[in-house]
């Protein structure tokens, strides 16, 4: 899944939030989960992918990231409150889709 996107990772349910941007969400989610990203997210243990939004270009994604970073905590939570109310780790879904795509490609 190489596509520009904005994402939010959390330290735990109702915990600290970090907003970021990447062109490779599965890789970046893995890096956060394993503590490979130095800085704020590592310091506060932000490892759970709770929200993401895909974009057509990196410029568009960076613009949106800046917009979201300026949001209050409540407004950030409102982005995913209806679609992910339990703050489930969405990265597991990314890896499942990736494995299915690999399998289909290999067997085709």
PLM feature spans:
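GIY-YIG nuclease catalytic motif and its immediate N-terminal context
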Residues: 1-38, 42-48, 52-54, 59-66, ...
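Short arginine-rich
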Residues: 43, 66-79
